[in-house]
Amino acid sequence: MAKCAICEKGVTVGIKLSHSHIRTKRTWNPNLQRVKAIVDGSPKRIMVCTRCLRSGKVQRAI
């Protein structure tokens, strides 16, 4: 799975626990959006998590 280009947030692995206590592995994926942003002075399409978008860490290109 892809990572956030700003904070490098990626997939988290953990354990799902059922009511009968059966443990199975599972993954949590970050909420990534493909946005057009200014990178090194030129517009480029990058994958960014929604937390970085909301906090203003990304300068969007028009």
From Swiss-Prot:
Question: One GO CC term of this entry?
Answer: ribosome
Q: List GO molecular-function terms, semicolon-separated.
A: structural constituent of ribosome
The family classification in the record reads:
Belongs to the bacterial ribosomal protein bL28 family.
NCBIfam families tied to this protein:
L28
Please give the name of this protein: Large ribosomal subunit protein bL28
Q: Which Pfam families does the record match to this protein?
A: Ribosomal_L28 (PF00830)
Q: At the top level of its lineage, which domain of life is listed?
A: Bacteria
